[in-house]
């Protein structure tokens, strides 16, 4: 069980370090060492671990919301339809080839951004 938790935390650590750069690496490494050595035996350690986990999840969630909000605003500025967005991007960047911009991809990314942002 502890190995599964350690693997999940490794994935969380990698995501957190990419998304929320203000999390200290040493804090993450200490937690992973604690899990691998199976020293989480006292109730105090478990409470500390739960508190750290909640803070980490909140930081990742907030970073994701910021990214989704930014992407949603950018899609809104470009236009709500994929055709409008594609036309505006090509207008802003004339050196870009039309084949590089697929309307389906633009629509899909804008749809994801709007869905994550709650619009």
Swiss-Prot record:
Alphabetically ordered keywords of this record: Amidation, Antibiotic, Antimicrobial, Bromination, Disulfide bond, Fungicide, Signal
Signal peptide interval: 1-20
GO biological process terms, semicolon-separated: defense response to fungus; defense response to Gram-negative bacterium; defense response to Gram-positive bacterium; killing of cells of another organism
Keyword Disulfide bond: yes
Claim: Signal is one of the keywords in the record: yes
Disulfide pairings: 75-110
Assembly with partners or alone: Heterodimer of a light and a heavy chain, probably disulfide-linked.
Protein name: Centrocin 1
Organism name: Echinus esculentus
């Amino acid at each position: 069980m502890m190995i599964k938790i350690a693997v999940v935390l490794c994935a969380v650590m990698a995501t957190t370090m990419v998304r929320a750069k203000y999390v200290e690496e040493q804090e993450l490494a200490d937690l992973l060492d604690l899990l691998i050595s199976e020293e989480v035996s006292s109730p105090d350690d478990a409470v500390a671990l739960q508190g750290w986990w909640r803070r980490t999840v909140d930081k990742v969630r907030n970073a994701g919301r910021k990214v989704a909000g930014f992407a949603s605003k950018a899609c809104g500025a470009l236009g709500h339809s994929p055709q409008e967005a594609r036309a505006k991007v090509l207008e802003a960047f004339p050196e870009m080839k039309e084949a590089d911009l697929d309307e389906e991809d633009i629509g899909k990314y804008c749809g994801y951004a709007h869905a994550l942002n709650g619009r």
